[in-house]
Amino acid sequence: MASFVMGYFLLFAVAFMCLDARTDKTQDYTSFQYHKGALLTGDVSINLIWYGKFKPSQRAIVTDFVASLSSSRRSTMAQNPSVATWWKTVEKYYQFRKMTTTRGLSLSLGEQILDQGYSMGKSLTEKNLKDLAAKGGQSYAVNVVLTSADVTVQGFCMNRCGSHGTGSGSGKKGSRFAYIWVGNSETQCPGQCAWPFHAPVYGPQSPPLVAPNNDVGLDGMVINLASLMAATATNPFGDGYYQGPKTAPLEAGSACTGVYGKGSYPGYAGELLVDATTGGSYNVKGLNGRKYLLPALFDPKTDSCSTLF
């Protein structure tokens, strides 16, 4: 079966040129359409496949984020703005579609697979990513491949910071599974894939923000993972919600690249909260006292980029 792969472009030369138009509520988003395909539904596990060297503290940054998305844990997150509140924009796509089924989407942290021995080497192709993703469970799951800072990936830093797509399942004929890949850009291209925690390669050179978890690479990965999670939920197989050509669409997260808070403009992420102790900038809170900076998502009901405050 032919597979679908969509790279998540976070090249800020493009983002800076487009940001003003994307944050303008008068912008015409009528081409942001539902293309009659499936959305993710049901109880879905997020399996994490760690490729390369990650410290336990680094893995915890991501696992706490994924766990914060879980609907079963939302009652423990009374403080707003929260990761769960941010995810509610994704839920609007299900309401907007007027789904006939009562099944929505419930996410939970699934299994974790550690590949610290670089079983496929330190230079990966798209096929390698799919093979790694296939190691996770394929039933009601999204398999997330996370590559460490010393691993190069085809297209990484040149035209993408991560991607989502589908692979052929190992079950019945015609089955397929969704996967995500995100790379740690800290030593390779932080100005492209970890802004605003690093000065951008192009555009206005405002001082970088302090990463909320004191890890430019991992906090940048969370930004990209969050956007790709939203895209995977609303366009898992390439025929869900998106704007523009199918080969290079704008999706729920990528339609709002570079927007994190109200008042954003090229070189400025927008109005954010700042931790009084660490100086880290953030816009949501998660489990275990975590704070994250998450991207604005495209709101299908208001036809605009939705920020939390």
Swiss-Prot record:
Can the keyword Transmembrane be found in this entry's annotation?
no
- Induction info: By brassinolide.
- One Pfam family named in its UniProt record: Phi_1
Compartment(s) of residence? Secreted; Secreted, Extracellular space; Secreted, Extracellular space, Apoplast
Q: Which UniProt keywords apply?
A: Apoplast, Secreted, Signal
Signal sequence coordinates = 1-23
Tell me a GO biological process for this protein: response to hypoxia
What is any one of the record's Gene Ontology cellular component terms? Answer: Golgi apparatus
Report the gene knockout effect: No visible phenotype under normal growth conditions, but mutant plants show diminished biomass production under low carbon and energy conditions.
As for what it does, the entry says:
May play a role in a brassinosteroid-dependent regulatory pathway that controls growth and development under low carbon and energy availability.
Entry's family note? Belongs to the EXORDIUM family.
- The protein's name: Protein EXORDIUM-like 1
Q: Which organism is it from?
A: Arabidopsis thaliana
